């Protein structure tokens, strides 16, 4: 029988800090283009539907590569797989900043490569944290980890718009991130361990036995796990909303400002990215508050109700729906009220991130965690494109 695997607590927290930092950069990469979308459209002369296709290509490549990374993450070195992913997405992001206007198809291709690289992190990193911490400790660490989804998204808008404002060239936003990602790669290699599967629960022997099962057997097992299936459908619905909100909100706010006569239309670069800065700041603040509220409410409420997690997710999503609806309806008449309801909607949506991750780790029962993670991705692949086609109508 293998000896129990152990790691000093300070090392576990240090590894968690590094993974949180990389998660921040991961989501900055997801949404940095949204922060300068008008400039990108003007530079490549693409319509709203093609701009949305840009995000669909990104997510589609993430989807197609997620099964590969899920398989590798469950059976081989997670640390090596993560390192490869960071190298791929940072290299592709840097390369995309040097593409000339007549090669827009190449920009789409590189954004797809960025999506492929980020797939490794989205599927594997949470499982590493799950093997470093247990129970309430794991819930808190995952809450902090998932805070960096809205924080990274918001900072992506801020970085893109601020760098464009300073330099007059949106390409520089894509050239700064790879420098930060090079630091992240060094920290990952030096400070993050690769714990055995199930190490935190001291189930190393069980985990090793389960790894012998086939990939198809894993899929069959998860397809019969109704907690996993239903929570995945819930995450899909939330992704439909957050995908549209995250990609199009800055452009929507810009055009609402034009309707109110507060802003001239963007006819040449650089565009006024004030709304990207404001929306980015809102996303950061509401994201931090929402993730902390959701995680703490879940931790406290499940002491009296074992179904606390799904109830918190459902109630926050139901409450977010009218807020986001009012934000859209009120934008042409009262701009301030639109911002208020948009912030409330974002806060309520953010309550779900850490909670659904905890649900995933609980329902997998020590089996293929990275495979579970990638199975949440397929339904979301085409979500940006319907919204984007509608904006051209």
Region roles according to the model:
Residues 110-150:
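Cytoplasmic helix-loop-helix junction between adjacent transmembrane helices
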Residues 33-34, 225-292, 349-353, 357, ...:
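Extracytoplasmic gate region of multi-pass secondary transporters
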